[in-house]
Each structure stands twice: as structure tokens, then as C-alpha cells.
Amino acid sequence: MYGIEYTTVLFYLISFILVSYILKTITKIMDYLIYRITFIIVVLSMLSNAQNYGINLPITGSMDIAYANSTQNDNFLSSTLCLYYPTEASTQISDNEWKDTLSQLFLTKGWPTGSVYFNEYSNVLEFSIDPKLYCDYNIVLIRFTSGEELDISELADLILNEWLCNPMDITLYYYQQTGEANKWISMGSSCTVKVCPLNTQTLGIGCQTTNATTFETVADREKLAIVDVVDGVNHKLDVTSTTCTIRNCNKLGPRENVAIIQVGGSNILDITADPTTSPQTERMMRVNWKKWWQVFYTVVDYINQIVQVMSKRSRSLDSSSFYYRV
């Protein structure tokens, strides 16, 4: 009997020692894996470019203000700059090597060759649909054209902010806007948007839901329209669907690595009156219109002052990421 008890005690003792050894071994293996993974993550994070949201210091005022024209001591070896310009600029300059010339001039301001990218667009519509804001800093040159002030101001509102959008099926559903940040954005070669506000019985308020000619017109033959209606009220919409698309969008906040330079025009377009623009400052400026060479020379001269008051953000997105995101 005593032999059986000793055997039982010995069995439990050996089992305890064996389990303890297994647990210690597992603990050592886990510690090794955790330290190894942590070490790899630290090394990779040091080698990669981390996001830098920066401080919100948007560009204010216009280029008519006397800025200091100086060359920075610090160059931008790790930054990229995208300069967007209309087709008419390259057409007027008519020089196959003009981009190389500008690259050499940017080099005198501390921007290495290969860090500045020149991107051409044909019109406001094309650029608003597919801006490709890929660089650390993105500067858009927009020629002021009489009669297109509304398209330009709405393009500014679109690309200076980030939007989260969903498609709208206006043939099946009524839609309402839930707050000041909620807008309907339509794009196309010719966008006419009409709305009919509805009461709680889904009857038209001042309009007939079955007759689009009685709807209120909120956008008429525009390339880009950001539509704002009364919040909390259902609306039936009528849109020229053959030449236009419309989406339900929410403004998420400022896109701080984008600035707009308005070329020409008596006054700078102001988008700060929109209560959804927060903070109430703007990243738009104006340069006097002369010739496109003169415009580019001015941009080169003041590029470092412009960039210093922008925020470099490595998550620059194109339209598929910020406009058509669902």
C-alpha cells in the first residue's frame, strides 16, 4: 500500500516538473518571437516614411502681399512637389524643354532634380474627376476665366477638402442632407440639378413630384456643382443623367497638402464663407496674369514660402480614394 502511495506521489511530482518545464519552454519561445517581431517592426518603421499630419497652417491672403523672396538653406531631399497646370500653358510656352528649364530653376530653391512633377490637365471637369494628388505637396494653377467662377470655386472646395461619398439612385429613392457637412456633388460635361422638397406625406412642397418642370433648379449646366439644400427634409431629384453623375458626400476635413494659385482675375475666389470650411482660412492665392512663363517664374520664386505654410502628408490621395470612396 505504501508502495502505491509513493508511486502516486512520484507520478504527480514528475508530472508537475514536466508541465513546469513545458511552460517555461513555451514562455521562452513566445518571448523570443515577441522581441523578434518588435525588433523587425522598429527597423521597418525607421526605414519607411511615417505620416506627418503637421500643423494646420493654411495659406492666407494673396500673392499681392509682399512676401520675402529667398532661397531656403534646407532642401527638400525627401519631399515631392506636384505642379498642376492647364493645357494652355504648355501651348503658349511652345518649348519642348520648358519642364527641364523649370526643374533647373527649382533646383536653385533647394528642390532636387526629379522631385518636382509637372501634370497637365485640359479643363476643370477633367481635373475635378481625376486630380491624382499623389505628391507630398500639390499646387494647382487655375486660370481665371470669366463665366466659370462657380466651377472654379467649387473645384477649390472639392480638392482643398477630403470627402466621403456614396452613389445616389435618384430614380428609386428620396434623399435628405443630415448636416452642414453633407452635400450632393454632381460632375459632368453639363449638370443641371433640380430638387423638389417633400413634406412628411411625401408630397411636393411648392412642386409636383411627377412633373420635373416644377422642381427648383439649384445647378444649371455646370461642370461641377456642390448642391446644398435644407437639412432634414427629403427631396426628389432630377439630374441630367446622360451628361452628369451625382453623389451623396460628407466633408471630412481639410486636405492640408494642397494649395491653389488663381492666375488672373480681379479678386481671389473666397470659399471661407461656407460654414463647413473649418478653420475659416483658405489655401488659395492669386498671381497677376501676364504670360505663363512669368507665372511659373513667380511660382519658383515663392515656392518655399508657399510650402512652409502647408502640411506635408504622405497619404495624398487621388479621386478614387477620396471622391468615389464608398
Curated annotation (Swiss-Prot):
InterPro entries per the UniProt record, alphabetical: VP7 (IPR001963), VP7_1 (IPR042207), VP7_2 (IPR042210)
Chain intervals for the UniProt region annotation (LVD motif): 237-239
Presence of keyword Signal: yes
Region annotation (CNP motif) ranges: 165-167
Cystine residue pairs: 82-135, 165-249, 191-244, 196-207
Molecular functions (GO terms): metal ion binding
Positions that bind Ca(2+) 1: 95, 206, 214, 216
Localisation per UniProt entry: Virion; Host endoplasmic reticulum lumen
Keywords, alphabetical: Calcium, Capsid protein, Disulfide bond, Glycoprotein, Host endoplasmic reticulum, Host-virus interaction, Metal-binding, Outer capsid protein, Signal, T=13 icosahedral capsid protein, Virion
Residues involved in Ca(2+) 2 binding: 177, 228-229, 231, 301
Signal sequence, renumbered to the chain: 1-50
Keyword Signal belongs to the record: yes
Free-text description of this protein's post-translational modifications in UniProt: N-glycosylated.
Domain of life where this protein originates: Viruses
Glycosylation sites: 69, 211
Region (GPR motif), start-end ranges: 253-255
GO annotations of cellular component type: host cell endoplasmic reticulum lumen; T=13 icosahedral viral capsid; viral outer capsid
Subunit and partners: Homotrimer; disulfide-linked. 2 Ca(2+) ions bound at each subunit interface in the trimer hold the trimer together. Interacts with the intermediate capsid protein VP6. Interacts with the outer capsid protein VP5*.
Extra facts: Some rotavirus strains are neuraminidase-sensitive and require sialic acid to attach to the cell surface. Some rotavirus strains are integrin-dependent. Some rotavirus strains depend on ganglioside for their entry into the host cell. Hsp70 also seems to be involved in the entry of some strains.
Protein function: Calcium-binding protein that interacts with rotavirus cell receptors once the initial attachment by VP4 has been achieved. Rotavirus attachment and entry into the host cell probably involves multiple sequential contacts between the outer capsid proteins VP4 and VP7, and the cell receptors. Following entry into the host cell, low intracellular or intravesicular Ca(2+) concentration probably causes the calcium-stabilized VP7 trimers to dissociate from the virion. This step is probably necessary for the membrane-disrupting entry step and the release of VP4, which is locked onto the virion by VP7.
Record family assignment: Belongs to the rotavirus VP7 family.
Name listed for the protein in its UniProt record: Outer capsid glycoprotein VP7
Origin species: Rotavirus A (strain RVA/Pig/Russia/K/1987)
Taxonomic path: Viruses, Riboviria, Orthornavirae, Duplornaviricota, Resentoviricetes
